[in-house]
């Protein structure tokens, strides 16, 4: 008698959408019941890395939001800022025109969610960095962000508090996130930002070599620095650095109306020449005249300690909303 072996068909690997829903469900549960927030942060970091570049970027943003998450949690996410698994060098070779360079380091010294950075030397002897975009990153992020939209809508519908994830805020965040994959826009942002800050003596913005850039690569001046969170020189005045950073943002927002909106520690440095260095110009916000005027008024009210003025300006700008049914402005002012 002939026996025929039968095998169960292999299950297809779970889709990205299924993985995303599974992560969201587990995170909501763990966030409510896991008391050790460092443990939660470590688990979240590993899950985001597995889910891919879109979620790594969301983790980078979360790592800087000490106003929303406990420090034990955000500390675990900090490695996402510049320590993401890189794509293979053979993929890089297919993207980069190596004929431009006399030297090109195959191992990236920095790998982020949307691209990775290699050191190189141009034929004119200039030391540069080459930022290489991950393959198909826009399409990947588009699918992922559509899944995130669907999950947030579901969670809000069933009564789960999603924080600042209203439809408007979510859509705006996704728009900026997808915009970061546009290297031509980032090149223009970097050129304009450098021009805006050229007279600010304590700020350094690397030069872009546009002739060597493409839709998938950005070639910039190499500027060495230390991360602001890893300064080792005991003689460095950290208070002065903080003041310089604040002053640079006053210039960016109120004077130029064009500011760096992704200032996590992986995108900021302090050079040996005592300058604050800005990197990565994928997320830059161009303020309208109305918003610039609003910021100027807001800073004036903060200096004058005018609480009523601060609240009124924030309401006028749409930063906060007030329900007059439950809470009136005089009630807020009296707090």
Task: Explain the meaning of each model-derived region.
Residues 262:
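Conserved catalytic-loop position in the HRD/HxD motif
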Residues 1-250, 257, 269-289, 293-327, ...:
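Broad phosphate/nucleotide-binding scaffolds in NTP-utilizing and phosphate-metabolizing enzymes
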Residues 265-267:
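Catalytic-loop Lys-Pro-X-Asn motif of eukaryotic-like protein kinases
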């Amino acid at each position: 008698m002939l026996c025929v072996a039968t095998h169960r068909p292999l299950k297809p690997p779970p889709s990205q959408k299924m993985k995303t829903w599974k992560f969201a469900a587990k995170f909501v549960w763990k966030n409510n019941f896991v008391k050790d927030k460092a443990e939660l942060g470590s688990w979240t970091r590993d899950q985001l890395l597995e889910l891919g570049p879109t979620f790594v970027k969301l983790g980078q943003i979360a790592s800087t939001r000490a106003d929303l998450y406990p420090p034990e949690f955000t500390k675990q996410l900090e490695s996402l800022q510049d320590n993401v698994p890189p794509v293979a060098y053979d993929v890089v070779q297919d993207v980069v025109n190596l004929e431009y360079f006399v030297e090109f380091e195959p191992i990236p010294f920095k790998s982020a969610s949307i691209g990775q950075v290699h050191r190189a030397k141009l034929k004119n002897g200039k030391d540069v960095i080459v930022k290489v975009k991950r393959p198909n990153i826009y399409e990947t992020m588009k699918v992922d962000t559509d899944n995130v939209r669907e999950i947030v809508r579901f969670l809000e519908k069933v009564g789960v508090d999603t924080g600042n994830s209203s439809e408007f805020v979510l859509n705006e965040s996704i728009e900026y996130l997808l915009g970061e994959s546009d290297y031509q826009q980032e090149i223009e942002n970097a050129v304009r930002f450098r021009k805006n800050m050229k007279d600010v003596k304590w700020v350094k913005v690397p030069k872009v070599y546009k002739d060597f850039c493409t839709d998938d690569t950005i070639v910039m001046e190499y500027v060495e620095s230390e991360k602001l969170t890893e300064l080792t020189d005991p003689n460095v005045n950290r208070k002065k650095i903080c003041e310089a950073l604040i002053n640079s943002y006053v210039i960016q927002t109120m004077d130029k109306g064009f500011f760096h909106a992704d200032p996590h520690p992986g995108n900021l440095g302090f050079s040996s020449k005592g300058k604050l260095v800005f990197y990565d110009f994928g997320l830059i916000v161009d303020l309208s005249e109305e918003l610039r005027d609003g910021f100027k008024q807001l800073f004036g009210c903060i200096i004058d300690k005018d609480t009523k003025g601060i609240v009124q300006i924030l309401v006028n700008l749409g930063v906060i909303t007030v329900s007059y049914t439950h809470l009136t402005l005089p009630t807020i002012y009296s707090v």
